[in-house]
């Protein structure tokens, strides 16, 4: 499928919108009351620091809602204003934040039913409005919705669209796209749909395995057992790893994406030599600025003397998880929560340790003077961060 031609035709359709409906003023009040915070604004103006009693809060200097998320949520609110009577669907969570998605449900925005990973688009009728989330949607989903005669409102983050353009360049050059990401993450599913041939690697360990295979060959069946769910249909590691291009899920850890890119570059250089390297390897910077800024701010925060860190964001939020990883690497006690309600009653917290299920820790907050680091993922509203901070202050009074 010529994905570029399809996108061009879709963008010209009068049933497609990706710029909103000019109703920013109409929805600004609702957005401000639901998501903004005077307390957080005050923290920003006072060196990202706040002390009450024996608790000092130290807030990361880049955190929370990014521009792409703000844009997606605003367009979703505008869509309800523009189509007050129509049935509105969304193909997935608009962003990985439970409170934001709940607000959309309260606005009668319905979520496409999904069972065992399969979406049921039979519920969508001609003339319905369908919102594509900030992560984007696969080409196949867009094509299906277009054929159904739906009004498509596309809130895909422009940084994600940039990655799609990158993998289309890979395709035109007959390069396999090596995508650093989680193969079943919504964004990576969408990105891979624009590629002809692709392989998704989760981390540096998997990338090293692939590079060893490129240089030394190996057991093809073992390779496919390991990556069978993370590659394009008909993928052949003996054929499809001769020409590669690098892309990534925009929310991955910047340092790991860079390390993976350099590893593949060294591998192809070793195999084909400097004269032929450009024929066999393409590198593009598809790391999201907002993701990078939040990670850089977290690296700065963990250099301070902190007793613990609270990381706030959806449990399925990739960028939030990577912020937690930074705290763990520095051996700072960290607690990943998605809402203030996870704290209490009493000195108890329900949180999600890395790579495990939700757990409850009690007591979790040490006695005495404390300096607590706070950060949040790109899908977390300031209001949620405020609620967490206030809950922490409440604990010292209880």
UniProtKB/Swiss-Prot annotation:
It catalyses: isopentenyl diphosphate + 2 oxidized [2Fe-2S]-[ferredoxin] + H2O = (2E)-4-hydroxy-3-methylbut-2-enyl diphosphate + 2 reduced [2Fe-2S]-[ferredoxin] + 2 H(+); dimethylallyl diphosphate + 2 oxidized [2Fe-2S]-[ferredoxin] + H2O = (2E)-4-hydroxy-3-methylbut-2-enyl diphosphate + 2 reduced [2Fe-2S]-[ferredoxin] + 2 H(+). Pathway: Isoprenoid biosynthesis; dimethylallyl diphosphate biosynthesis; dimethylallyl diphosphate from (2E)-4-hydroxy-3-methylbutenyl diphosphate: step 1/1; Isoprenoid biosynthesis; isopentenyl diphosphate biosynthesis via DXP pathway; isopentenyl diphosphate from 1-deoxy-D-xylulose 5-phosphate: step 6/6. The active site is at 187 (proton donor). [4Fe-4S] cluster binds at residues 66, 157, 288. Dimethylallyl diphosphate binds at residues 96, 185, 317-319, 379. Its EC number is 1.17.7.4. Its cofactor is [4Fe-4S] cluster. It holds the Pfam family LYTB. Binds 1 [4Fe-4S] cluster per subunit. One of its GO terms (biological process) is terpenoid biosynthetic process. It comes from the Bacteria. Isopentenyl diphosphate binds at residues 96, 185, 317-319, 379. Keywords: 4Fe-4S, Iron, Iron-sulfur, Isoprene biosynthesis, Metal-binding, Oxidoreductase. It is an enzyme of class 1 (oxidoreductase). (2E)-4-hydroxy-3-methylbut-2-enyl diphosphate binds at residues 96, 185, 250, 317-319, 379. GO terms for molecular function: 4 iron, 4 sulfur cluster binding; 4-hydroxy-3-methylbut-2-enyl diphosphate reductase activity; metal ion binding. Gene3D superfamilies: 3.40.50.11270, 4-hydroxy-3-methylbut-2-enyl diphosphate reductase, catalytic domain. Catalyzes the conversion of 1-hydroxy-2-methyl-2-(E)-butenyl 4-diphosphate (HMBPP) into a mixture of isopentenyl diphosphate (IPP) and dimethylallyl diphosphate (DMAPP). Acts in the terminal step of the DOXP/MEP pathway for isoprenoid precursor biosynthesis. Belongs to the IspH family. This is 4-hydroxy-3-methylbut-2-enyl diphosphate reductase.
């Amino acid at each position: 499928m010529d994905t570029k031609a399809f996108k061009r035709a879709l963008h010209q359709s009068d049933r497609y919108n990706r710029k909103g409906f000019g109703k920013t003023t109409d929805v600004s009040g609702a957005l401000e009351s639901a998501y903004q915070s005077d307390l957080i604004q005050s923290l920003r103006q006072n060196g990202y620091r706040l002390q009450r009693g024996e608790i000092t809060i130290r807030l990361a200097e880049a955190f929370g809602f990014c521009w792409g998320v703000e844009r997606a949520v605003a367009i979703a609110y505008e869509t309800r204003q523009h189509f007050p009577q129509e049935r509105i669907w969304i193909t997935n969570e608009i962003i990985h934040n439970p409170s934001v998605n709940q607000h959309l449900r309260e606005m009668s925005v319905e979520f496409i039913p999904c069972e065992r990973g399969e979406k049921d688009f039979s519920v969508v009728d001609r003339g319905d409005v369908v919102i594509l989330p900030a992560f984007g949607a696969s080409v196949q989903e867009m094509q299906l919705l277009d054929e159904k005669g739906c009004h498509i409102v596309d809130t895909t983050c422009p940084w994600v669209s940039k990655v799609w353009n990158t993998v289309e360049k890979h395709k035109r050059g007959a390069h396999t796209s090596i995508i650093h990401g989680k193969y079943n993450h919504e964004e990576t599913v969408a990105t891979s749909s624009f590629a002809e041939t692709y392989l998704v690697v989760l981390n540096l360990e998997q990338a090293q395995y692939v590079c060893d295979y490129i240089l030394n060959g190996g057991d093809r069946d073992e390779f496919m057992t390991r990556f069978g769910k993370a590659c394009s249909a008909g993928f052949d590691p003996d054929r499809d790893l001769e020409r590669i291009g690098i892309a990534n899920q925009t929310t991955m850890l910047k340092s790991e994406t860079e390390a993976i890119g350099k590893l593949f570059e060294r591998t192809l250089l070793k195999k084909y030599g400097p004269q032929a390297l450009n024929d066999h390897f393409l590198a593009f910077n598809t790391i999201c600025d907002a993701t990078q800024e939040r990670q850089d701010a977290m690296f700065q925060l963990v250099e301070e003397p902190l007793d613990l860190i609270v990381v706030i964001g959806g449990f399925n939020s990739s960028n939030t998880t990577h912020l937690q990883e930074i705290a763990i690497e520095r051996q700072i006690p960290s607690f990943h929560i998605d809402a203030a309600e996870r704290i209490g009653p009493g000195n108890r917290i329900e949180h999600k340790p890395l790579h495990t299920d939700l757990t409850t820790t009690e007591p979790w907050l040490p006695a005495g003077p404390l300096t607590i680091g706070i950060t949040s993922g790109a899908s977390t509203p300031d209001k949620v961060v405020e609620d967490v901070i206030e809950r922490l202050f409440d604990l010292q009074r209880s």
